[in-house]
Amino acid sequence: MNIDSDIFKIQSNNVLPSRGKILISEPFLRDATFGRSVVLLIDHTEEGSMGLIINKQLPIFVNDIIKEFKYIENIPLYKGGPIATDTLFYLHTLADIPGAIPISKGLYLNGDFDEIKKYILQGNKVDRYIRFFLGYSGWESEQLSTELKENTWLVSKEENAYLMNGDTKDMWKQALEKLGSKYETWSRFPQVPTFN
């Protein structure tokens, strides 16, 4: 029986990173923060890159850190990355929030937090409209380019509806499957091969 020895050969898809694109970690990355992660690039310049891990939910809720949200339905909180873990970031689809930074068409970062709080406290829907993160992921100048050359990441573009979907359990696998059959084997590879 002939086995294709290239199916696990990690190879980048050569899509260039830019604001609004996602990074998908390769399946063999053994890192507590970035293993099996999907990272939305918030900025990518010659000086460096910034992103938010969008598929790693924390065991606490936004309600635990924002006292005004104490008596409303629990709002999930995600680990945006290992930098500035005491800082709250938020992605949203609310175009009328003053000071919000456009990330892609219809998707924004931060802005006037009082307006975000007001929106939530008025009983408006949060799921699929706002996602909160503690910390962010950052790369120094040329660091992300080096990691891409080392095939640590694949770069892709996703729709906002997918990025803001509340169900992130299988997001890494789904992101790989959307890239085509070449990456399907990766998506099925066990996280801990010795447990297979």
Curated annotation (Swiss-Prot):
InterPro entries: AlgH-like
Gene3D superfamilies: VC0467-like
Cystine connections: none
Range of residues in the leader sequence: none
GO cellular component: cytosol
Family listed: Belongs to the UPF0301 (AlgH) family.
Protein name: UPF0301 protein BT_1078
Protein source organism: Bacteroides thetaiotaomicron (strain ATCC 29148 / DSM 2079 / JCM 5827 / CCUG 10774 / NCTC 10582 / VPI-5482 / E50)
